[in-house]
């Protein structure tokens, strides 16, 4: 495989990106975004999308490109190797669907000034547990949709910024107008057995 040939140490990341929780969270987000855009958003085609902490882009990039009319994708991650693999995994969307894909190797909390210059319709962050609050993120488009998820897996040190409720997530992101909010139960395995937690999305 590409990973084995180029970066065998990234096989664990690849396996984690295919885990049920990540798949379910990504699918849930894309389904709700699709519904929201069809019902409320003035623009339904040629969408410009910014993904923060895009990692390998799996499964989010294929889900977006196969289910929405995406014209541009901006994928932002601090890990340069993940970006290189993402370029390989998703190049056919650029070649066959003519989606303009741009990768950014940035550390999000220190790059709001640059990120806010990007003109997009949709901003996605599926793992705000691992990020500092996004209140400073505005993008160039005041009408942009922001779709984010977080969880309450605090005891595992899963992330630096877990939340305990939807209200906490709204405050963390700095959103006033909420078009969708929801909670989904998920499970993971710890040293002392199976644990249940809440995944929040707005």
What are these regions (language model features)?
Residues 43-57:
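Conserved class I S-adenosyl-L-methionine
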Residues 71-78:
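Conserved SAM-binding motif I beta-strand of class I
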Residues 118-135, 152:
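A short SAM/SAH-binding and catalytic strip from SAM-dependent methyltransferases
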Residues 46, 119-120, 143:
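Local beta-strand N-terminus motif with an aromatic residue
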Residues 1-45, 81-122:
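S-adenosyl-L-methionine
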Residues 132-201:
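C-terminal substrate-binding/active-site "lid" region of AdoMet-derived donor-dependent transferases
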């Amino acid at each position: 495989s590409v990973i084995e040939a180029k970066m065998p140490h990234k096989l664990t990341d690849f396996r984690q990106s295919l885990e049920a929780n990540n798949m379910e969270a990504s699918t849930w987000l894309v389904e709700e975004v699709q519904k929201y855009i069809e019902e409320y958003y003035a623009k339904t085609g040629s969408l410009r999308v910014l993904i923060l902490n895009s990692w390998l882009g799996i499964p989010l990039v294929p889900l977006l490109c196969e289910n929405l009319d995406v014209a541009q994708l901006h994928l932002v991650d601090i890990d340069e190797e993940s970006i290189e693999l993402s370029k390989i995994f998703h190049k056919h969307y650029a070649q066959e669907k003519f989606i303009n894909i741009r990768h950014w190797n940035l550390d999000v909390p220190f790059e709001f000034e640059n990120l806010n210059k990007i003109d997009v319709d949709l901003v996605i962050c599926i793992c705000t547990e691992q990020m500092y609050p996004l209140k400073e993120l505005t993008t160039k488009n005041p009408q942009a949709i922001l779709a984010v998820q977080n969880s309450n897996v605090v005891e595992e040190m899963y992330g630096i910024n877990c939340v305990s409720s939807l209200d906490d997530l709204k405050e963390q992101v700095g959103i006033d107008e909420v078009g969708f909010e929801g909670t989904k139960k998920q499970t993971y395995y710890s040293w002392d057995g199976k644990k249940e937690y809440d995944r929040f999305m707005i």
